[in-house]
Swiss-Prot record:
GO annotation (BP), single: proteolysis
Name of the protein in question: UPF0758 protein Daud_1467
UniProt similarity note: Belongs to the UPF0758 family.
Positions occupied by motif JAMM motif: 179-192
Gene3D superfamilies named in the record: 5' to 3' exonuclease, C-terminal subdomain, Cytidine Deaminase, domain 2
Alphabetized InterPro entries for the sequence: MPN (IPR037518), RadC_JAB (IPR025657), RuvA_2-like (IPR010994), UPF0758 (IPR001405), UPF0758_CS (IPR020891), UPF0758_N (IPR046778)
List of residues binding Zn(2+): H179, H181, D192
Domain MPN: 108-230
UniProt keyword list: Hydrolase, Metal-binding, Metalloprotease, Protease, Zinc
Molecular-function GO term, any one: metal ion binding
Pfam families in the cross-refs: RadC, UPF0758_N
Origin: domain of life: Bacteria
Length: 230
């Protein structure tokens, strides 16, 4: 009978264990698999938590796929039961909520990088186009993130009336438009450029400035303002 030996995490050298590495070097020093292993806490009889984490990431194609995996899909992986699957789903949901709760601290947005950073971790994983607006006051503080519409895989429909009705209700001074491209490529389409120009002109009429339109891709973005497209 063949015998295969596996080190448990407790049997690893202390400097190689994920929790110890996090404490010594900070959370950003850990790989995706190591972070996931901390959530999983244990593996199976034949695999460590890190091995199991690598299997999960491989099965779902990395973090992006894992973020969209449901409870039943996670439990289809050997070694992942109700507790582990719930912990993974809860961790991703907390990350998404933290990434898009501006009303709790009202950040100031002065650059395209700051605007994109506010919504990136939530919008980059959507499998349909979502159109949002960052609603700003006169000091560029975010009053709200308005979720204006949900479209299809490659398009979204936005009516100026709906966009500016909510902005006026919140006494907005300006807006930053944001939407995602599920393909991961943030390059603007001709329709994106046309819509931006139309909404910019509508904003001029009602007295609410459209400062930018940010297109979110897979951990990258395009600012139509920086590109000189409106």
């Amino acid at each position: 009978m063949a015998v295969e030996y596996h080190l448990t995490i407790k049997e690893m050298a202390a400097e190689l264990r994920p929790r110890e590495r996090l404490a010594a070097h900070g959370v950003q020093s850990l790989s995706d698999a190591e972070l996931l292993a901390i959530l999983l806490r244990s593996g199976t009889v034949t695999t460590t938590a890190i091995d199991l984490a690598n299997q999960i990431l491989s099965r779902f194609g990395g973090l992006r796929g894992l973020a969209e995996a449901g409870i039943e899909e996670l439990q289809a992986v050997k070694g992942v039961g109700p507790a582990k699957s719930a912990e993974v789903r809860a961790a991703f949901e907390l990350g998404r909520r933290a990434a898009c709760r501006p009303g709790e601290w009202q950040p100031t947005v002065r650059t395209p990088e700051e605007a994109a950073g506010l919504v990136m971790e939530e919008m980059r994983y959507f499998d349909r186009e979502h159109f949002w607006a960052l609603v700003l006051n006169t000091k560029n503080r975010v009053l709200a993130v308005e979720k204006v519409s949900v479209g299809t895989l490659n398009s979204s429909s936005v009516h100026p009336r709906e966009l500016f009705k909510n902005a006026i209700r919140r006494s907005a001074a300006a807006l930053i438009l944001v939407h995602n491209h599920p393909s991961g490529d943030p390059a603007p389409s001709p329709q994106d450029i046309e819509l931006t120009q139309r909404l910019f002109e509508a904003g001029e009429i009602v007295g609410i400035k459209v400062l930018d339109h940010i297109i979110i891709g897979d951990n990258k973005f395009t600012s139509l303002k920086l590109e000189g497209l409106f």
